[in-house]
Amino acid sequence: MGTGMGTGTGVRTEMGAGMDTPPELAVDRLLDDPGTRIIVCCGAGGVGKTTTAAALGLRAAERGRKVVVLTIDPARRLAQSMGIDSLDNTPRKVAGVAGGGELHAMMLDMKRTFDEIVESHADGERAAAILANPFYQSLSAGFAGTQEYMAMEKLGQLRARDDWDLIVVDTPPSRSALDFLDAPKRLGSFLDGKFIRVLMAPAKVGGRAGMKFLNVGMSLMTGTLNKLMGASLLGDVQTFVAAMDTMFGGFRTRADATFRLLQAPGTAFLVVAAPEPDALREAAYFVERLGAERMPLAGLVLNRVHGSGAAQLSAERALAAAENLEEGGIVDQEAGKAGLGAPAAHSPAGGSAPESEGVEAGAYTDAPEGADVEGITAGLLRLHAERMQLIAREQRTRDRFTSLHPDVAVTEVAALPGDVHDLAGLRTIGERLAAGVPAGA
């Protein structure tokens, strides 16, 4: 299956010797390529898209590029990590960026962006009438698809200004990642569609003839709407439509233009996911959709991947050792399932586990008098077993994705112990993005 992978960014490497190992996503090569003008981070909600976008922007800036990051509803801590108390619809320069580049950040204000469209396409009197209209205020503040449409609109505005050589976009959180591609077209079609044209007709006919047309042609619909939303709704809608008459044709045109911009060679999509079934299922859908729309997919960023410094000790052996300790038994080094000796406190003649088995020699010799060394050790072994089981589940989930999409380049980002709260944390994420290894390697 095609993935829409662009060839101009040079982000893919050759497949490894094992066919199950996907190509590695060369993040720095992508960021350094002057032909890369837009990076879109997309995927399901709650997988670290916003942090990934900010980390990519910082890394690109510190490698010499002039970057703006367009975020959608970021956590306050993330804004503060960039040294900004609050983000708004205006790009703000981030202080403390090393290297020769610049980093600017902004947060989409969908209502303000909609207001800007009105103000730029209508004269002062008409713009004021539109902005004060109750139906417009509801539409601009939360109509289905408005946030996605305005994200596309703002992206088009930033690209047209040409003040930055790289724009990193964090797509809106939504029930489905596909909404980012679908919702702008839906809203544009609504605003340019038959429903609006029907509402325009009475205003264009005018006077009693217009009201007669409205009463005959729309009585059922308006009756239902009035029951649901109040008798004043129709008047607000008609006033809105009359004021917006000269603007409606542009909504779908601008949405289509931005959609074509997303298909252009200078754009790169990064699908962001976590090693969880739902997130990777959504990522797989998005990969397929990008291929169908012929959009340039750079690869998959797999966040919050867990590992272990004692991976040579399997979950099964750790559990077996824990059970023996809890039962008060002594594990035989030659025949025991766990392959671990008894704790040093009870076996001074060499019962300590060798370091190669993941337990340091003499680990128990400094235990406080009266401490339940066996119980503590058994608990730690069970925690290790749970971690190894989690790692195995994540690996199986990754393997399912890579078996379906073996040509999609992958980088993995190890899970962090806490939240990112400063530029140093974003740098760490950027370093892990650039140094990540393919799943299964």
Go through each PLM region and give its residues.
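P-loop (Walker A) phosphate-binding loop of NTP-binding proteins
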Residues: 44
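Nucleotide-state-sensitive switch-loop elements of NTP-binding domains
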Residues: 2-3, 16-39, 47, 52, ...
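C-terminal lobe/tail of nucleotide-utilizing enzymes
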Residues: 1-5, 9-33, 222, 226-242, ...
